[in-house]
Amino acid sequence: MRSWSSPQVPQLPGRGPELRLYDTSDRQVRPVAAGAGPGSAATMYVCGITPYDATHLGHAATYLAFDLIYRQWLDLGHDVHYVQNVTDVDDPLLERAARDGVDWRALAEREVSLFREDMAALRILAPRDYVGATEAIADVVELVEKMLASGAAYVVDGEFPDIYYRADATLQFGYESGYDRETMLRLFAERGGDPQRPGKTDALDALLWRAARPGEPSWPSPFGNGRPGWHVECAAIALSRIGSGLDIQGGGSDLIFPHHEFTAAHAECVRGERRFARHYVHAGMIGWDGHKMSKSRGNLVLVSQLRGRGVEPAAIRLGLLAGHYRGDRYWSDQVLDEATARLRRWRTATALPAGPDATDVIARVRQYLADDLNTPKALAALDGWTTDALDYGGHDTAAPRLVASAVDALLGVAL
């Protein structure tokens, strides 16, 4: 699947400290082990959209968080292999297409195209591999075959012989989320699972292959026509594009369970590994009007709508950066107004013919971003330099240009 064009990232003098991120499974901030050895790329797999609606600010905040990681790795001199999927066949997509009377493939392509436009406008660095689930059917089939052969999967008897993954197929299942069984069952039911499905060995067993139903898309396989389950798509794409030794598995915090837990379990089961990724990283939710922003609630603030109103994407980006990536937070007109004012001040300061020395502020921005992407402190450091430049001036003619390059390279905001 075609990705979008990445902006050029300026190279800065020097380097900052190694990146440290909060790991969901370990419940602590710790160093990110980027690359398995000398010359190895830093690897990251981030779950993409299900393309049945336009990109909202919750999506934007998630992909912005991982864009920051990408940028910190580049600043540290790493090659980066970033993979993102598109769940371009799934129940919500099929239901929306049926509701609107459109072909599900046309709906997916339309929304993916809009997503690309939004990501490019927000200056999100593109993944090296941008893969639709429908492009990875063969990879999914291979994984399901291996799980059936090992006994980690089974076929449910009945009119539709669906294939399920045994939740107890790996001893470590549950380590990523750390949730107890009661919480798992609740979230499983709320987030696409089917705990009441007759014939399952365990209510938590997850769908691997949905046998073909009338009127639904399906693909041939050795175990009958059908389509992939949600979690196995990501496991198959990550393993086929990156393989073992994934540095970061990431996405929104609403994906911790069941999606990321089962994606990791599928991969670990097939590869015989204790841990799918070295780091599990999750971004917080964005709210509006007192609630999490979601398609099901209908309280979306769409990136394309903001752009259509003439809001500059750099201001959207700065507004999202004003909060820490892991925290749930609310978007508001005030957040946007403050971001717009900040952008204006930064641009005024970096357009000056000279300013205060930039060495210290760039070092502090690097330090704050290396500390679990502490963007509020990074922005505050830049605000301090901006105030000094506007109020007191300076004599370093290279400083304004260098600060602008640092803001571009490290935060993705073009001044």
UniProtKB/Swiss-Prot annotation:
Q: Name one GO biological process term.
A: mycothiol biosynthetic process
Task: Give the enzyme's main class according to its UniProt record, as a single word.
Answer: ligase
**According to the UniProt entry, where does the motif 'HIGH' region sit in this chain?**
49-59
User: GO MF annotations for this entry?
Assistant: ATP binding; cysteine-glucosaminylinositol ligase activity; cysteine-tRNA ligase activity; zinc ion binding
Known cofactor(s) = Zn(2+)
- Motif stretch ('KMSKS' region): 292-296
Relate the protein's function as given in its record.
Answer: Catalyzes the ATP-dependent condensation of GlcN-Ins and L-cysteine to form L-Cys-GlcN-Ins.
Subunit architecture? Monomer.
List the protein's name: L-cysteine:1D-myo-inositol 2-amino-2-deoxy-alpha-D-glucopyranoside ligase
Organism (species): Mycolicibacterium paratuberculosis (strain ATCC BAA-968 / K-10)
Q: What is the lineage of its organism?
A: Bacteria, Bacillati, Actinomycetota, Actinomycetes, Mycobacteriales
Q: Which gene encodes it?
A: mshC
